[in-house]
Amino acid sequence: MKFSEMPYKRIDMEEVEKEYKSIIERTKNAKSGEEQFEIHREYYKFTADVQTSMELAMIRHDIDTTDEFYEKESDFYDEVGPIISQYENEYGKVLYDSPYRDYLESKLSLIHI
């Protein structure tokens, strides 16, 4: 698929925050490393979708800075980007402090915060 054909949809920040909170809470309450790893797989897919939307908007704005639609989208992501970063940092801390960290690192790699 060509870049120009990639569909763009603005994220629903309310839904994004709800999903981050759910993932973080479920990770904290996981009863095993396997359970945390499965939640991490969900997290990875979820954040990839969020990041794709953000990147599409930013790149399309950079390609044509006169496009008002993508200028507004870029402004939106400039606003919500720090909020998303806070959730990602919080999730990273939960993994770092996990009692199953050794298991997760055997599946993923070293966990840094």
Model-assigned labels for residue ranges:
Residues 28-37, 93-95:
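Charged, low-complexity interaction regions
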Residues 33-45, 70-71:
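Short, charged, amphipathic alpha-helical segments
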Residues 64-76, 89-108:
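Long amphipathic alpha-helical coiled-coil segments
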Residues 111-113:
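Conserved small/polar residues in nucleotide/adenosyl-binding loops
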